[in-house]
């Protein structure tokens, strides 16, 4: 049987039900995200529209009709001087991890960030159960820039975050 090829493309509203399901898994079962209530498809539509309005990339990786993962870049902080710094988000369907989907998404996301005018990309990664995310970011040139201790409390335990950073474009 032929397996459909993986395609990374811009997210569209029709993808958001699958994006919602992927993220809901991580919200409810892990500390990969500090959200505690899964956003609805309507919430995701607002995020998609907001990022599109800022010319920031929101991508999905699909194989046939199945969205296997998604990635997007959002503003790092709201203050104007941070306008050239974004935070990346990459999630892969739990049924499709270990297949290169995260790598395909991040490989497409970084040039999209650069086209949007970003100079720095920050990854904020929970230090518990996130070895794959840390390894993914290292493979793409991110370096650890810091650690914040006990900044989140989810599922009854305190969680540290690791900050990873990658510069885009020419050096300063």
Segments from the language model and where they lie:
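Acetyl-CoA-dependent GNAT
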Residues: 38-95, 106-107, 112, 167-169
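A short beta-loop-alpha structural element at the N-terminal edge
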Residues: 7-19
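Conserved GNAT acetyl-CoA-binding A-motif
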Residues: 113-126
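C-terminal "cap" of GNAT-fold acetyltransferases
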Residues: 5, 84-86, 140, 150-172
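Conserved acetyl-CoA-binding loop-helix of GNAT-fold acetyltransferases
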Residues: 98-113, 131-139
């Amino acid at each position: 049987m032929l397996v459909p090829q993986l395609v990374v493309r811009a997210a569209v509203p029709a993808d958001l039900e699958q994006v919602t399901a992927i993220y809901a898994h991580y919200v409810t079962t892990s500390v990969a995200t500090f959200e505690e209530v899964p956003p609805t498809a309507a919430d995701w539509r607002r995020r998609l529209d907001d990022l599109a309005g800022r010319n920031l990339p929101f991508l999905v990786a699909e194989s046939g009709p199945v969205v296997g993962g998604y990635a997007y870049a959002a503003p790092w902080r709201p203050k104007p001087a941070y306008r050239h710094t974004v935070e990346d988000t990459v999630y892969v369907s739990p049924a499709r991890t270990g297949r290169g989907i995260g790598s395909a998404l991040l490989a497409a996301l970084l040039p999209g960030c650069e086209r949007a005018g970003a100079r720095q990309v920050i990854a904020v990664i929970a230090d518990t159960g996130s070895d794959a995310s840390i390894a993914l970011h290292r493979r793409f040139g991110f370096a650890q820039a810091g650690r914040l201790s006990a900044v989140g409390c989810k599922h009854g335990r305190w969680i540290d975050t690791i900050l990873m950073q990658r510069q885009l474009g020419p050096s300063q």
